[in-house]
């Protein structure tokens, strides 16, 4: 069986000097290898093909047959690595917390321990007749959330 660690090392070698980053590698018991990469400006098919060929050049099909799939992390998929938070700062995201809260807002900041989202809330201010829309920052640790993902908007 092909080891995940081996595939990760091959991918990291290809990534050197590039702005791409590794999101996830999975290797199933029947040697189906799935590699997900990402980039701040999106993933190009030509780069997926190049990475696929690079991996194939490092693995020996004669020794062990495998199926290989290389692609992007997916625009509507939950974030899996910290770099995905970094590249989406300033963009709208959806956050679902472990206690079931679901909110959408602008990703303002992220570091290794937490991230901050600016959320629009209706608040009735003293002396006003109608609630006003205000933005409030909410900060979460990664342990508090079920998932965060880029919110696709068709506005």
Swiss-Prot record:
SUPFAM superfamilies registered for this protein in UniProt: YhbC-like, N-terminal domain
Primary subcellular site in the record, as a coarse category: cytoplasm
Signal peptide residue numbers: none
Localization (cell): Cytoplasm
Protein keywords: Cytoplasm, Ribosome biogenesis
GO biological process, one term: ribosomal small subunit assembly
Record InterPro entries: Ribosome_maturation_RimP, RimP_C, RimP_N, RimP_N_sf
GO cellular component: cytosol
Annotated HAMAP family: RimP
NCBIfam families: PRK02001.1
Family, as annotated: Belongs to the RimP family.
Protein task: Required for maturation of 30S ribosomal subunits.
Protein name: Ribosome maturation factor RimP
Species annotation: Bacteroides thetaiotaomicron (strain ATCC 29148 / DSM 2079 / JCM 5827 / CCUG 10774 / NCTC 10582 / VPI-5482 / E50)
């Amino acid at each position: 069986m092909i080891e995940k660690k081996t595939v990760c090392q091959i991918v990291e070698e290809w990534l050197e000097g590039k702005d791409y980053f590794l999101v996830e590698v999975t290797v199933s018991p029947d040697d189906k290898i799935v590699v997900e990469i990402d980039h701040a400006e999106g993933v190009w098919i030509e780069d997926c093909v190049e990475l696929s060929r690079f991996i194939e050049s490092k693995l020996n099909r004669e020794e062990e047959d495998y199926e290989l799939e290389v692609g992007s992390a997916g625009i509507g998929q939950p974030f899996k690595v910290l770099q995905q938070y970094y590249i989406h700062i300033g963009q709208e995201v959806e956050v679902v917390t472990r206690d079931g809260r679901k909110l959408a807002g602008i990703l303002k900041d992220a570091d290794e321990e937490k991230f901050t989202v600016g959320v629009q809330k209706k608040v009735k201010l003293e002396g006003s007749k109608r609630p006003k829309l205000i933005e409030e920052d909410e900060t979460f640790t990664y342990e508090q959330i079920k998932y965060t993902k880029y919110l696709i908007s068709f506005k």
